């Protein structure tokens, strides 16, 4: 049998895009021989290493593409601070069943109660479990789409918000939205309706959403209809965690 040429094998592995196997096959072959492991065991170790590397890279890519401002986890959440929070409800959301059922998640509460933290943690968990995610704010969506419309590329820009398995819309209601902005946001909500879920954080209870959308009751009703038809609403009550030190003094 002609001896294997490592250079030729390395080139073939590069062409097949198998970096883990290329880097480790010689060392693992030596180790397998020393341990008298079978060829199948050796091959399984190589393939398992390649698969693990690819999965880790996929996770890193999904997290990078999600554009989280920071990374948060459920373990970091301060459960003791909010005056009212349904912990079992939130923990159940992290089973991620809402993605398969296209159920929206709406986190309602005043500023500084951890709504953004929970939305990021939920998105991060989705990334770890193989789902694409995009984190953005309501104002950023409107500004991006308005600029795209002026540049004649609105249809293409819509895909940024329609493609992810989970779209996180942070800070809905913190700033007023004019008629044009509300129409653009409605198109995103409408096109994701019963196709892919959204995670929305807001400081406004539903009965005050018309104040967000320039007191347009018709548009507000249409938005609420699509958001709430399949939705899990999380109510958080209390004082801002960012004011914790001042409050406790």
Residue positions per predicted region:
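Clamp-loader machinery-focused feature within the broader ASCE/P-loop NTPase space
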Residues: 53, 58-92, 100
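Conserved, well-folded catalytic cores of nucleic-acid-processing
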Residues: 15-19, 28-31, 49, 53, ...
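Interdomain "pre-motor" coupling segment immediately N-terminal to P-loop NTPase/helicase cores
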Residues: 10, 18-70
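Solvent-exposed alpha-helical segments within well-ordered globular domains of core cellular machineries
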Residues: 7, 11-14, 23-26, 41-45, ...
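Intrinsically disordered, low-complexity and often Lys/Arg-enriched segments
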Residues: 1-11, 153, 246-249
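Conserved P-loop
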Residues: 85-163, 212
């Amino acid at each position: 049998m002609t001896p294997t040429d490592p250079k030729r094998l390395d080139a073939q592995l590069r062409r097949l895009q198998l970096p883990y196997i290329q880097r480790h096959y010689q060392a693992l072959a030596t180790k397998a021989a020393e341990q008298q492991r079978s060829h199948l065991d050796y091959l399984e170790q190589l393939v398992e290493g390649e698969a693990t590397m690819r999965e880790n890279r996929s996770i890193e890519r999904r997290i990078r593409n999600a554009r989280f401002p920071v990374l948060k986890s459920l373990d970091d959440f301060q459960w003791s601070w909010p005056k009212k929070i349904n912990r079992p409800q939130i923990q159940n959301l992290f089973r991620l069943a809402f993605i398969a059922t296209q159920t929206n998640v709406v986190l309602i509460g005043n500023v500084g109660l951890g709504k953004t933290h929970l939305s990021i943690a939920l998105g991060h968990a989705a990334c770890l479990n193989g789902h694409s995610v995009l984190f953005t704010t309501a104002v950023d969506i409107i500004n991006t789409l308005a600029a795209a419309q002026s540049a004649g590329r609105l249809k293409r820009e819509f895909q940024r918000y329609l493609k992810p398995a989970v779209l996180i819309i942070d800070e809905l209601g913190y700033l007023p939205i004019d008629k044009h902005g509300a129409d653009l946001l409605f198109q995103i909500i409408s096109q994701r309706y019963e196709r892919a879920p959204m995670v929305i954080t807001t400081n406004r209870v539903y009965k005050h959403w018309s104040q967000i959308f320039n007191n347009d009751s018709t548009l507000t009703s249409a938005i609420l209809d699509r958001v709430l038809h399949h939705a899990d609403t999380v109510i958080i009550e209390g004082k801002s965690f960012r004011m914790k030190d001042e409050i406790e003094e």
